[in-house]
Each structure stands twice: as structure tokens, then as C-alpha cells.
Amino acid sequence: MPNWDIETVYNASDPRDMLVNNPRLGDALAAIFGINTTQPTSPLHRTVLQRGHGFVTVGTSVEQVTDFAYYTASNARVQISALLLNGAVGGEGVKYLSAQERKDTANMNAWIVFKPWAQWVKEVERSGMFVNELGTPPAPQRESSD
């Protein structure tokens, strides 16, 4: 996963507030996602770490990017635990997903993203912390594989 450091693109007049708040900084952040030569409509990387911030993730819909963000944070916690446990007991290392596993799970995630979305919407509605005055949009439809 690429790491982006805003310090590398600041100019002399930029405030050092860590905010991506102008087109030049936005272009620099967008460029770090890379160009996917096999799928030109998708970035090479869906998630980028930002020094001093956390991460940025992109997707084709609010549902998809929410899913990516949730599971990126969740999986990072699991990976940190695995690395700490491995270091504590002198294990053989953490086995990461292979290139084929990453590709195949990305394809699977493209259609499974809507499964947790409905549950998250209901949780937010029940929490009372959010009032949607626009109404509930229709549920997204999965593309048919006919």
C-alpha cells in the first residue's frame, strides 16, 4: 500500500496544516493511487496511507467506499495483532495474500459490498444521531451475470 507524505508537495506559501485543500494537493494525492493498465477505469491502488492522517480509499459508490474503509481499518487491526504476536513468540512470519488471492477477493468484494450496507443504514437510522430528511434511497441492485 503506497504511503503519501503531503510534505513532499507543499510549496513555500502552503500552510503546513496537513489538509488537502487545493487542486494541486488533490492532484498529488490522486496520483499516488496509480494507473491500472489492465483496468483503466480503476486505480492501481484502492487505498493509500497518508502520513499524519490515516488512509484514503476510493470506490465506485458510497456503499463500496464505506465497505473498503470499514474493512481496511478492521483488517489493519488484525494485521497489527498478527505482527505483534509473531514478534512476541518468534513465529515464522505473517503470510500475506498472494497476487491471485488479492485479485480473486477483489472480484468477490465487488458484489458482496451491499450485504453489510443495509445493516449499517439500519444501525445509523436506529441510533437517533442522524436524521435523514431526504428519505431512504432504493437499495442498490447488483449487476446480473446473465
Segments from the language model and where they lie:
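Glycine-rich flexible loops
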Residues: M1-D146
